[in-house]
Each structure stands twice: as structure tokens, then as C-alpha cells.
Amino acid sequence: MAGFAELGLSSWLVEQCRQLGLKQPTPVQLGCIPAILEGRDCLGCAKTGSGKTAAFVLPILQKLSEDPYGIFCLVLTPTRELAYQIAEQFRVLGKPLGLKDCIIVGGMDMVAQALELSRKPHVVIATPGRLADHLRSSNTFSIKKIRFLVMDEADRLLEQGCTDFTVDLEAILAAVPARRQTLLFSATLTDTLRELQGLATNQPFFWEAQAPVSTVEQLDQRYLLVPEKVKDAYLVHLIQRFQDEHEDWSIIIFTNTCKTCQILCMMLRKFSFPTVALHSMMKQKERFAALAKFKSSIYRILIATDVASRGLDIPTVQVVINHNTPGLPKIYIHRVGRTARAGRQGQAITLVTQYDIHLVHAIEEQIKKKLEEFSVEEAEVLQILTQVNVVRRECEIKLEAAHFDEKKEINKRKQLILEGKDPDLEAKRKAELAKIKQKNRRFKEKVEETLKRQKAGRAGHKGRPPRTPSGSHSGPVPSQGLV
């Protein structure tokens, strides 16, 4: 099998790979690196955990070393967490170059990001929405001279679903040069990607894994048929079972909404499970902290929406539980790809209700494998059913109370927008009015206090003869007129 040197990579990059413990290139790296070094556009499709990131990072770093300038490469990714993970790969492999990178994602200060962009870093890793915001609002940087445009998890970026990046991508593509290398990488090949393969003009190279299934052999995939209304009781029973049998195992539980994610996290903590949540409603710092705590095994259970289903490399996850059956097979593939990574064993269990049978059939058809049933003792589940339902309701009430003020503020902002007003300007105006009112109130209180003191002083002088200045005479004083 060819090594990294045989792919055409420079000796310093081969040495970096050796130091990282990368001894042999993976199939996607063997297929794509030579084509990228030749200057060809590339579309690579391979299952999760196959080394797709290094397949584009290595050749880009080699080309950068030959002609270093900024901004040399733009990498687009659908999630913030994946952006930071890609940046880490660039930093580690590009350390001998003195590589400068810049991460442009939502939830962070735009002014600081604009300053970083103006310094012309070699590589920009961004989510489409935030980068498009910078392009629309700032002229302190340019991506008109980039050499590489990379779309990681390209199927998610290009699909028109609940998260539609179309408008932002149009703004970005209008700002990049026509003469560039475009690299698309994904774990799933969609119709959109097939169309792009046919439209590419820069000697396009297409590589797809030859494996007949989209999930790895080391992954034990099962389903658990449960009634919709008792799903949470089955989930608690499953986690308790894994915790009793394997205390050191790490578990990821995937949910379909931010609210469900937060409620389940609160509920499992009530049962004393070491749980942390990860979803898009959290502040960016909270998301980083949650991931760090899970990766370092401070918390053994991560409850997440699909922001954690793509690209995140957490090699020590033993179990993935789908709290809901994914609506699309590719979502299932990305979720279960968080376990059984790098040759390790892993288990994936999907909670299936009576309404999800057709979704399971679609998944089985895609992965070319039948899911086996996971058996549990129903009597044990029934014993905790009432307790789980009560705790769940308590958590729902607590969450609603905690977010009441926030929802009220959001509704106010919506109303102002409907009235043609800028919510931020209105808030600023109200703050200024409040300051003026407070200043007037303090002035009024000060005047009233002065008047009271004067009144008290006059009352103390009543009954006393008026004091006569020294050297003056008593008697009427002649009028001096108005001064």
C-alpha cells in the first residue's frame, strides 16, 4: 500500500503525518490527494471517520507552502463545532508553515472577526451565514483571490431543508474567483452532488467509497419498538442498564428539537445521570464547554440535536441512541457514525414508535442491512413509568417558566418589526429616555431636599429679633430700587 510520500506530498508534510501517528493514507486520501495536487476539482464521498478532512487539508497545505499568501483557502461547513475541528487539523498539520487561520462562525463578536479577516489569514473556516454577513457589511477583506474553496459536509450545505444556506452561499460564490479549485466532501452522495459532478469544468475528479454499506462493520445497529407515550421511560431504562453494566462508557443521545434536548437533559439529571446538552439555542461558549466536558469524560452522557451528528470526532463514544427515528437515512448514517470510529466497536439503538416503521425500512434500504431488535424487560420499564412521566412534566414546567421572559421579549421585537421599527434602535431610545427620567428624578429630589432645609431654617428663626449688622442703624432702610 502506498504511503503519504508516494502520493506526492512533501517530506515535511509526511513527517507531520508521522508525528500525528498517521502511518498509511486511508482510501479517500489515496484517491483524492493526487488529483487535488494536480489542480483538479474534487468530489469525495466516504463514510464518517474515513479521514476526509486530511484528504483536503494535506494537499492545500502543500500548495500553500509553494505560494503562501492570504486569503489562500476558504472552507465552508454547516456547523460551528465542525469549523473548530477542521481548524484544529489545519493548525496541527500546518504548524511548520506558521499557518494563520481564522474561524468565522455565529455566536462570536463580529468586530473581532472582522479584524481577524482584515489581517489576511492563510485559511478561513466559516459557516455560510456569518461569512455572508461579513461580506454584506464589511469591505475590509476580500476572497476574490482564493485558490481553494472547500465545502465539507457538502450535502448539508447544498440541501434545501430546515436549514437553507442557499441565499448565503449565493453571496459567497459571487465573491470568490471563477478560477479556483473547488473541493466537495461528504459522507452521503445526494442528487444535488451528482448534478454538481456533471456541471464541474475544472477537470473534475470523483471518488466514492467502494464499500456496499454506508456504515462500518464494527457497528452493532439495533432498534427498540416502543409506544410513543412511554418512550422516555424506555430511554431512562436503557441508560440505567448501560451505566450498571459499563460505568465508563460514553453515550450520545440524539433528539430532533432543541426543546426536547433541553428537557431530556434536565430530566436525566434528576435521575442523577451525568448529562450535558448540546443544541443550537445554547450560547457558543456553552456549546464549547459542553463538548469539552463530554470529550474529557467529566460527563458520560451527551444529549444533542443534529449539530453534533456531523464531523465531530469523539473516538471514545461506545453507544449512540436515537431518541427519535431520523426522517432521512443520511441523518441516521451521520448520527450513528459518531460511534465505532477508527476500527473500534460501537452500538447504535434507535427508539422506534408505531408511526416510524416506514422510516426504518428506508434506513435499512440505504445501509443495505437489517436492524436487529434490542430486547428489554418491559416489567422493569413499567416500574419507573409513572416516576419518569412526573419528572418529565416537572422539567417541562420549569423550562417554560425559565423562558417566559425571553419569549415575551421576542414577541415584542416581532411586533416592532411589523410596525416598521428597528427593535435595536427602539431599545436604545428607551434606554436613553430612562436615563433622562432618572436624571430628572434625582434633580427633583435634590431641589425638594434643599427647599425642606430652607423651610426648616426659616421656622427656627421665628420669634427672634432680626440681626443688625455691625455699624448700621436700626430703622427703616431706604429703598435702593431693583438690582
UniProtKB/Swiss-Prot annotation:
Q: Which UniProt keywords apply?
A: ATP-binding, Helicase, Hydrolase, Nucleotide-binding, Nucleus, RNA-binding
Compartment(s) of residence: Nucleus, Nucleolus
Extract the GO molecular function terms from the UniProt entry: ATP binding; ATP hydrolysis activity; RNA binding; RNA helicase activity
Q: Name one Pfam family in it.
A: DEAD
Q: Record's superkingdom?
A: Eukaryota
Task: Please indicate the residue ranges that the annotation assigns to the motif Q motif.
Answer: 2-30
Domain (Helicase C-terminal) spans: 218-382
Predominant location category: nucleus
Where in this protein would one find the motif DEAD box, according to its record? 152-155
Q: Which InterPro entries match?
A: DEAD/DEAH_box_helicase_dom, DEAD_box_RNA_helicase, Helicase_ATP-bd, Helicase_C-like, P-loop_NTPase, RNA-helicase_DEAD-box_CS, RNA_helicase_DEAD_Q_motif
Helicase ATP-binding domain residues: 33-207
Function, as annotated, reads:
ATP-dependent RNA helicase that plays a role in various aspects of RNA metabolism including the regulation of mRNA export and the levels of pre-ribosomal RNA. Regulates the stability and synthesis of pre-ribosomal RNA and thereby regulates cell proliferation. Also possesses antiviral activity by recognizing gammaherpesvirus transcripts in the context of lytic reactivation.
Stored PANTHER family = ATP-DEPENDENT RNA HELICASE RHLE-RELATED, RNA HELICASE
- Which family does this protein fall into? Belongs to the DEAD box helicase family. DDX49/DBP8 subfamily.
- Would you tell me the protein name for this molecule? Probable ATP-dependent RNA helicase DDX49
